[in-house]
């Protein structure tokens, strides 16, 4: 097998497919292994199955039993329609050995039942450990995936017993970042929820058995964006070297600018603290979101750039100890390679599904730090100016698909850096003497702010059965909410944003070993209030008002 073919799926034995990870999927899997599950995602969806009145099961125990059976069968079917949920990953931390994926085709009921037992859990609100959806989510993002090979895990969260006001159920999809990003979350949920409403649970307790067509998983197995790019764009050696040099330039930028950058300041006593992921969320309701979008259009800037600029300015005021000596900010920004890839298989490809397309680049953004950067109408011109700079700098990294050629180089560097970094962290944690502040700052120093725009989450709000008779009966599924959170086991928290149902949702996950919750709350609140100021500026005369953060 050639090295290149090793990055495509190969059948190594009957019903077993394997391939070597390539690019950021390799780095993501390795990062999860060495950092106790760092970046594993917990993505929620809230829904209700509406049964026809003639069924007579609404509000009964039978309704809940039907729901569990539907979800079980839909989860099995999704195993074949979106096979990444059942892909197993290597779990080693040896950077010299490639990360790899394995997918096993299961055909019999015994194997499928065993897989469901390993990867699906049913909990009910009100039970111990499940007082709220947030508590269930917190459980999932405060431990690494427990499934064999880090396969996805699906939690079905049932409503409280006898709660007549809220009969909604919830999903928490817990998944490796090596196999999902903001762009592919929607695709998974659309498949899973449709499979739910299409399900016809058996009355004898047997489970769904995939059809022969569904068992043909090769066209649907997840490809690396690097492999898909190489096949579609056929980069030359010069393209690959230019991309690698651009990536090295980006690493040099971080080294050159960190000392003069606005930054998050980790705690100095982190060796005495335990890892704990805390997720902070803020929602901008639909009316204010419309005003924010309106403001962005007026100044010819997208909400992504306004929100990333708000993140920078919020950093300055939350960590003022860096402000006086800073001339700007290193800013981490996410981009997505799928913008350059065909959504249909190109000639010679068995499939073109690439559930992980995102990566990050760092930008240098000059900021006038000699003024107040608290949220206020007076500060809007500075925010708009910073947003324009971010857009201009990011666009330099969006000009050519050949940047994808750099992903294997960056991933290899990342795995080496992570190995060294975690050796230093664990060494400091185990040290017989307490390292001094200077020693600790060499291991965990100031952190550049980062922003990840997931974009619009295109999960449908209504699902009807494919069967005409089932549809005619009045059976349907309503999806009413969705959100995302993630496990954080490092010192570099990022703020992320998505839009769904007209709302804009901000999320900040951080590791309490390295950051104080109060500081993270302030950082998120300032970012959020900057966006509210922009929304208000869309329909108000912009005058001088006191900084909103004065009311924190």
UniProtKB/Swiss-Prot annotation:
Briefly describe its induction.
Expression is induced when cells are grown in cultures containing vegetable oil as the carbon source.
Uses in industry and biotechnology: MELs not only have high potential as eco-friendly biosurfactants due to their excellent surface activity, but also have attracted considerable recent interest because of thei runique properties, including self-assembly, anti-tumor and cell differentiation induction activities, and moisturizing and hair-repairing properties.
The GO terms this record gives for MF are: acyltransferase activity
Q: In which pathway does it act?
A: Secondary metabolite biosynthesis
Keyword terms: Acyltransferase, Transferase
Q: Does the keyword Phosphoprotein apply?
A: no
Sorted alphabetically, which Gene3D superfamilies does this protein's record hold? Chloramphenicol acetyltransferase-like domain, Nonribosomal peptide synthetase, condensation domain
Identify the EC number(s): 2.-.-.-
Q: What class of enzyme is it?
A: transferase
Q: Which InterPro entries match?
A: CAT-like_dom_sf
> What does the UniProt record say this protein does?
Acyl-CoA-dependent acyltransferase; part of the gene cluster that mediates the biosynthesis of mannosylerythritol lipids (MELs), surface-active substances that enhance the availability of water-insoluble substrates.
| UniProt similarity note | Belongs to the trichothecene O-acetyltransferase family.
Q: Kindly provide the name given to this protein in its UniProt entry.
A: Acyl-CoA-dependent acyltransferase MAC1
Q: Lineage of the source organism?
A: Eukaryota, Fungi, Dikarya, Basidiomycota, Ustilaginomycotina
């Amino acid at each position: 097998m050639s090295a290149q073919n090793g990055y495509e799926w190969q059948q190594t034995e009957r019903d077993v497919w394997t391939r070597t990870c390539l690019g950021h999927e390799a780095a993501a899997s390795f990062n999860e292994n060495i950092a106790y599950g760092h970046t594993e995602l917990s993505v929620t969806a809230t829904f209700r199955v509406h049964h026809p009145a003639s069924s007579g099961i609404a509000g009964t125990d039978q309704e809940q039993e039907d729901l569990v059976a539907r979800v079980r069968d839909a989860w099995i079917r999704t195993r074949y329609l979106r096979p990444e949920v059942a892909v197993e990953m290597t779990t080693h931390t040896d950077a010299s050995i490639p990360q790899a994926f394995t997918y096993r085709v299961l055909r019999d009921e015994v194997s499928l039942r065993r897989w469901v037992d390993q990867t699906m859990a049913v909990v009910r609100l009100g039970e111990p450990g499940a007082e709220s959806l947030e508590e269930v989510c917190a459980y999932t993002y405060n431990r690494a995936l427990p499934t064999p090979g880090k396969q996805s895990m699906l939690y079905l969260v049932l409503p409280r017993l006898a709660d007549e006001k809220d009969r909604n159920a919830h999903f928490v999809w817990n998944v490796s970042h090596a196999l999902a990003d903001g762009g592919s979350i929607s695709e998974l949920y659309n498949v899973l929820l449709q499979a739910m409403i299409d399900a016809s649970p058996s009355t004898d307790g047997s489970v769904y058995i995939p059809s022969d067509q569904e068992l043909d998983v090769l066209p649907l197995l997840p490809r690396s964006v690097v492999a898909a790019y190489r096949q579609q764009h056929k980069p030359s050696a010069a393209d690959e070297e230019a991309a690698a040099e651009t990536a090295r330039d980006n690493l040099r930028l971080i080294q050159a600018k960190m000392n003069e950058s606005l930054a998050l300041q980790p705690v100095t006593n982190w060796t005495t603290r335990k890892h704990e992921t805390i997720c902070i969320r803020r929602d901008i309701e639909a009316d204010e979101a419309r005003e924010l979008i309106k403001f962005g259009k007026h100044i010819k800037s997208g909400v992504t750039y306004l929100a990333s600029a708000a993140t920078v300015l919020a950093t300055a005021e939350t960590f003022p100890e860096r402000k006086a000596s800073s001339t700007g900010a290193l800013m981490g920004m996410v981009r997505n390679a799928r913008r350059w890839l065909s959504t249909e298989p190109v000639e010679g490809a068995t499939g073109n599904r690439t559930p992980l397309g995102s990566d990050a680049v760092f930008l240098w953004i000059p900021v006038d730090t000699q003024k107040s950067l608290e949220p206020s109408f007076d500060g809007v011109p500075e925010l708009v100016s910073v947003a324009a700079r971010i857009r201009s700098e990011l666009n330099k990294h969006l000009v050519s698909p050949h940047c994808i050629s750099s992903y294997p180089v960056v991933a290899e560097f990342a795995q080496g850096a992570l190995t060294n970094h975690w050796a230093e962290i664990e060494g400091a944690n185990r040290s017989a003497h307490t390292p001094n502040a200077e020693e600790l700052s060499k291991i965990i120093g100031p952190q550049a702010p980062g922003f990840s725009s997931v974009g619009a989450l295109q999960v449908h709000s209504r699902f009807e059965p494919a069967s005409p008779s089932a549809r005619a009966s009045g059976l349907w599924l309503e999806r009413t909410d969705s959100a995302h959170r993630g496990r954080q086991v490092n010192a570099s928290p990022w703020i992320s944003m998505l839009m769904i149902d007209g709302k804009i949702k901000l999320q900040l996950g951080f590791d309490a070993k390295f950051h104080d919750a109060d500081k993270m709350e302030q950082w998120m609140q300032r970012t959020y209030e900057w966006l509210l100021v922009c929304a208000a500026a869309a329909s108000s005369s912009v005058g001088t008002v006191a900084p909103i953060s004065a009311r924190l």
